């Protein structure tokens, strides 16, 4: 959430920057500043009214002691009138502030200067590539056919049990899932991330804190009986650990990692992009989250990108790193790097990770602050990234490593799987 101070002092800057995200903020910013001016004027009037009320109320006892009953009664009437006026101001102020709050949360985060111009995924900038794309034989199969051939993932059974997008992993397929989760978590914890196991359902305040609400209700599974939301990513519960927290200056860096199943409605998805593991409603994902001082957050972002790259490299998957353009960025992000791996049998790139710096956008919603070196309270910066999302990693591993009548497991994973190949 953008600060009222920024919107008040630099409205044209905000409008210009949000245009980079294809967001026309002119009318909203103008309305916000009108309401903010009203807010401050009403607060000043209320403060003056309460001060006068307190001042006059203090006179009543003295007047009564002096026997000036009529004067005391007159002052009482004035105090009563001031109380009535204070209540009227408070009611008007509450209505004004509710409208103000509802508008401020509609504004996305400002993209940083590193973000390229552009409207869609085609305008994203490839900043790095790595690992060779394998050449597969003529009889190579996409992962959904390999899954059926080796009986390791049952998509039809998932449809029977729940619906499309809820696969059942079996045998070596299930063991591969478990191996990848443990592999990713071990790499993260060895890099200094504290492992946590959060709930997979969150309340509305948590969804608001990280920016999923009120922006993404339609993409989240909602348990209406208790007003809980299934997590779309571990980012939500892990970052909300720090909601309403003031960190000491010596507590940085804050580094956490978590595995959770993630749940996404993905309404409206169709076509070749949803075959097999390409797009699911339930998926396994390991996340890394950081909280940093503002001056350290971009160095932390570079560390996170390098960290995720090292994981992808170790799996031997051909990959590329993209810096997202303004028009393809999320509502909450100031800058995002996507990682994609090449699916040789499908002949296309698959996204497996997004690493983002949100600067103070989430922290302002969360009231996540810290005491700086001078003892002043400041908003912290938050960052997160997938390390990694499993479904498309599994898809690429199966497709790219099919050799003859078996699928070879990357060397780095073998201590975790307990087997060298799937046949």
Model-derived features with residue positions:
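TRNA-recognition modules of translation machinery and tRNA-sensing kinases, especially anticodon-binding
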Residues: 129-423
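N-terminal alpha-helical targeting/anchoring segments
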Residues: 1-134, 152, 156
């Amino acid at each position: 959430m953008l600060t009222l101070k920024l919107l008040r002092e630099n409205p044209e800057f905000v409008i210009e920057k949000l245009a980079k995200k294809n967001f026309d903020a002119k009318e909203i910013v103008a309305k916000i500043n009108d309401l903010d001016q009203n807010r401050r004027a009403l607060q000043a009037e209320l403060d003056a009214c309460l001060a006068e009320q307190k001042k006059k109320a203090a006179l009543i006892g003295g007047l009564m002691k002096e026997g000036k009953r009529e004067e005391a009664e007159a002052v009482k009437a004035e105090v009563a009138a001031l109380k009535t006026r204070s209540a009227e101001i408070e009611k008007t102020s509450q209505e004004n502030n509710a409208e103000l709050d509802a508008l401020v949360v509609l504004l996305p985060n400002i993209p940083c200067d590193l973000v390229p111009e552009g409207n869609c995924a085609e305008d994203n900038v490839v900043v790095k590539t790595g690992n060779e794309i394998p050449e597969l034989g003529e009889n190579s199969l996409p992962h959904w056919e390999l899954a059926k051939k080796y009986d390791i993932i049952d998509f039809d059974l998932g449809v029977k049990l729940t619906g499309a997008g809820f696969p059942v992993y079996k045998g070596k397929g299930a063991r591969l899932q478990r191996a990848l989760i443990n592999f990713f978590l071990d790499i993260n914890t060895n890099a200094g991330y504290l492992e946590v196991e959060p709930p997979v359902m969150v309340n509305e305040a948590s969804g608001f804190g990280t920016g999923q609400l009120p922006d993404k209700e339609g993409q989240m599974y909602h348990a209406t009986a208790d007003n809980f939301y299934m997590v779309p990513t571990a980012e939500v519960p892990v970052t909300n650990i720090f909601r309403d927290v003031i960190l000491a200056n010596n507590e940085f860096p804050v580094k956490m990692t978590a595995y959770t199943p993630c749940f996404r409605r993905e309404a409206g998805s169709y076509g070749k992009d949803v075959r097999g593991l390409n797009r699911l409603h339930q998926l396994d994902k390991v996340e890394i989250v950081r909280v940093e001082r503002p001056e350290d957050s971009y160095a932390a972002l570079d560390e996170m990108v390098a960290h995720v790259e090292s994981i992808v490299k170790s799996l031997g998957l051909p990959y590329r790193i993209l810096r997202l353009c303004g028009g393809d960025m999320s509502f909450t992000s100031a800058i995002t790097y996507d990682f994609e791996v090449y699916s040789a049998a499908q002949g296309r790139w698959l996204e497996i990770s997004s690493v983002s710096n949100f600067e103070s956008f989430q922290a302002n919603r969360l009231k996540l602050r810290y005491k700086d070196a001078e003892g002043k309270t400041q908003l912290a910066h938050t960052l997160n990234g997938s390390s990694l999302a499993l479904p498309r990693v599994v898809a690429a591993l199966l497709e790219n490593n099919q050799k003859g009548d078996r699928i070879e497991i990357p060397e780095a994973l073998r201590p975790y799987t307990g087997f060298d190949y799937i046949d």
